[in-house]
C-alpha cells in the first residue's frame, strides 16, 4: 500500500482529476454523495434506472463544472449489471478511480409470508449487483494499484430488524464482503470500506416517517436528537474516497447520530 501523501491536510480530501462511478445517485443519499464527490473535484458517472427522466443530480454536477455521464441499467437484471463498468469506463475515458455502491431497495413482509420474488429482487440489487460491480472495479483497479470502493451498508449490517429478512441478509453479507475484498486488495493499494446509514429521512423510510408511533420510538433513541439527512453523508463519502483515508481498510463507518451506541 502506498503511504498517505505528505501534503497539507485539506489537500488530502481533494478528488481533482479523478472519476467516480456511483449507483443509486438520482435521489436521497446517493444524490448527496455524487454531488459531494463532484464538489471535491471528481468527474462523475451515474447509474440510473432505465426509463428514469430524473436529471437533477446530473444537472447539479454539471453546474459545478464537472463532467457527468449516465449509464442506464436495472440493477435487478444481472446481465445488465455485468455491462455497467465497461460502459462507465468508455464514458469516462478509460479510468474509474472510485466506485460507490449506494443503490438499494426494500421489501417488507413477515418472514413466514415473505415472497420468494421479493427475496430475489432484494438480494440481486442490494448484494449481487454490489459484488459484480466491485469485482469489475477490482479487475480494473488492482493492476493499476489505485482505487477506492465504498459499499453502502446499513444498521442491519449489525442488527436483525423486523419484517425485512432479505434486506437484513443482504446488508449483513455486504459488511462481510467489504472486509473480504479489503483483505485481498489493501496490499494492492485499493481500499474497500463501507458506510452504514442510521435512520435517514429518505423515500426508503417513508412508511416509518408516516407512522407516528414508530417515528416517536425511533426518534427518542437517537442521541443526536434528529433523523439524518442525505447531506450528512457528504463528508464521510469524500473522506473514504480520498487520500485522507489511505490507511482505512475494511471498515464500516456508521453514520447514525449515535444510534448504535445505545
Task: Give the predicted meaning of each segment.
Residues 134, 170, 178:
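Active-site helix of classical SDR
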Residues 40-56:
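Conserved glycine-rich Rossmann-like NAD(P)H-binding loop of the short-chain dehydrogenase/reductase
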Residues 19, 26-27:
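Conserved glycine-rich cofactor-binding loop
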Residues 2-11, 159, 237-238, 249-262:
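Short C-terminal tail/terminal secondary-structure segment
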Residues 154:
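Residue(s) in the substrate-gating loop at a strand-loop-helix junction
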Residues 139, 183-187, 246:
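Alpha-helical segment proximal to the catalytic Tyr-Lys
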Amino acid at each position: 500500500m502506498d503511504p498517505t501523501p505528505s501534503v497539507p491536510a485539506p489537500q488530502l480530501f481533494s478528488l481533482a482529476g479523478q472519476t467516480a462511478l456511483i449507483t443509486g445517485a438520482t435521489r436521497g443519499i446517493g444524490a448527496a454523495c455524487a454531488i459531494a464527490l463532484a464538489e471535491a473535484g471528481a468527474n462523475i458517472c451515474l447509474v440510473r434506472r432505465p426509463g428514469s427522466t430524473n436529471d437533477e443530480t446530473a444537472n447539479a454536477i454539471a453546474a459545478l463544472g464537472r463532467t457527468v455521464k449516465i449509464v442506464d441499467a436495472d440493477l435487478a437484471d444481472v446481465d445488465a449489471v455485468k455491462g455497467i463498468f465497461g460502459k462507465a469506463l468508455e464514458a469516462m475515458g478509460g479510468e474509474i478511480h472510485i466506485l460507490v455502491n449506494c443503490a438499494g431497495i426494500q421489501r417488507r413482509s413477515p418472514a413466514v409470508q415473505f415472497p420468494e420474488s421479493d427475496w430475489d429482487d432484494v438480494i440481486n440489487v442490494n448484494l449481487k449487483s454490489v459484488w459484480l460491480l466491485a469485482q469489475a472495479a477490482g479487475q480494473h483497479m488492482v493492476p493499476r494499484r489505485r482505487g477506492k470502493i465504498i459499499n453502502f451498508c446499513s444498521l442491519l449490517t449489525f442488527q436483525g430488524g423486523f419484517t425485512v429478512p432479505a434486506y437484513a441478509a443482504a446488508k449483513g453479507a455486504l459488511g462481510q464482503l467489504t472486509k473480504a475484498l479489503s483483505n485481498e486488495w489493501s496490499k494492492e493499494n485499493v481500499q474497500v470500506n463501507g458506510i452504514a446509514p442510521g435512520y435517514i429521512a429518505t423515500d426508503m423510510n417513508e412508511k416509518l416517517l408516516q407512522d407516528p408511533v414508530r417515528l416517536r420510538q425511533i426518534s427518542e433513541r437517537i442521541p443526536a436528537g434528529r433523523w439524518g439527512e442525505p447531506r450528512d453523508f457528504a463528508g464521510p463519502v469524500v473522506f473514504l474516497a480520498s487520500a485522507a483515508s489511505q490507511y482505512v481498510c475494511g471498515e464500516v463507518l456508521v453514520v447514525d447520530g449515535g444510534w448504535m451506541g445505545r
